[in-house]
Amino acid sequence: LPEMLIAIFVSIVCFDRYLGDTESGHRAAYAAVILICAGMFALTLYPAWQISLGYLLAVLILCIVIRHWGHIRISQKDALIFVGEIALFCVILGSAVVTSWGTIQSMLHTAYPGARQSIGGGLPPLSLISSVGTLFFPFKDYAVDSVTTNMVEASRFVDLFPLGIILAVFGMIKRKKVDVLSAWLITVITLFSVFACVGMPLWLSKIMMLTSVTSGRCVVVLGVANIAVLVRAAAIIDGELSWKQSLLVTFVFAAILAWANHAMYLSYIGRLLVVVCFAIAGLLSFAVLNNGVIARTVVAPIVSVGLLVSGLSVNPVQYGSAPVTKQPLIQQVQSLQSENPGMWAIDDAFGSQLANLAVANGINTLNALEVTPDLATWKKLDPNEQWEEIYNRYAFVSVNVVEQESADVFTLVAPDSFTVHVTPEQLRKLGVSNVLSPQKLDAMQFNGYSFERIGETINGRTPYRIVQHQ
């Protein structure tokens, strides 16, 4: 995502300069940077963000063309240089595509996200105006299943929605003139707000090419577009409001945002954090509304320091790599692997997260996150491809060790998660030698196999070796 945002805004700045400059050498440099950004954006290969941010990119390109319309001059030399750069770009991008073609094909032909048919809907409307509360995530653990499952998915750009839209409309009415950029940004915000919160018919989603975009991924384009329209509106209404009017609007808006954050994160944001939300929203709003001496010399520095502290407090900046590399359980598994190399399986419904931690520490693990599906491995248990729809996807994989072969070896837990139910015999077929499990596997009965405990129980999980009986 950061690379995509960098690519969008660097390319937009260069495109604006390209149209405004007449020096061929400068234009060649701008075009080269634009094409580099285009390659960066294209090779991200994440349609949910590419398509939604593509709408924003198209709006920005359109507005820049409108801004320079009537003054755009492209010489024959400029055209030849641009064609040459395009040709070189196609060669480089083509080589990358050819090299990665297998991976690209695997991703495009998955049941998820390749065959996803999203119609949007399901995003709580309150989440659109509760971005301020996410600033507390680095300082206070967040896990509220009724809203979302983790801090990453719940995080938002602090965009002060809908202040930017309100100010933009106010400014256009005051000036009796439509601001093209603001109008198009508001259109994008409206489109994705409706798509994310309400949804739309599948046929319309297909027409608008949104079937690969989930509601949760819309928050990125909404945040960026809201910030853009907020900055634009602040420039338009500069000096239109007195400090008293700004203070009144700030108080009302900050109160609404504080309430919205409390309502959205009911068990997370208590009374104290509501007050803090009010203060943060108030400072940010006042800085936008009143571009005076107080805003520049007092409010802006306070806000800047606050955002800096919040940003620096995000993992892993705050804690370093110790939470990943110094876990006693993982250190024990590393030691066991060095003594007896072999593949591990992490048993348990939450084993997929622990499996990723194991992989991050160099442990050969069966059920880590599969960005592209490992069809060859899973077809060892499913030669007739009965469950291919389940495991042919981007997914977090959980393992459940059972005593008898399950009627359903694979079960779908979520669009990006499935569980494989296996006996030790099936694990051996997959190449697994060791299992880390919360179950007492050495007390369970298996046909022709058993488990031998090979380490200490740490955090409720014990390492075992699979033993085959003659």
Task: Describe the predicted segments one by one.
Residues 1-3, 190-244, 255-278:
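Membrane-helix boundary/interfacial segments in multi-pass membrane proteins
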Residues 7-19, 58-63, 67, 165-169, ...:
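Transmembrane alpha-helical segments
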Residues 19-40, 76, 80, 241-252, ...:
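Short hydrophobic alpha-helices at membrane interfaces in multi-pass membrane enzymes
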Residues 53-87, 174-176, 283:
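Perimembrane helix-loop-helix junctions
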Residues 74-97, 183-191:
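Hydrophobic alpha-helical membrane-interfacial segments at the cytosolic entry of transmembrane helices
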Residues 82-94, 290-317:
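Internal/C-terminal transmembrane anchor helices
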Residues 96-177, 181:
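Periplasmic/ER-lumenal interhelical loops and adjacent helix-loop junctions
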Residues 310-470:
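Soluble catalytic regions of membrane-associated enzymes that act on cell-envelope
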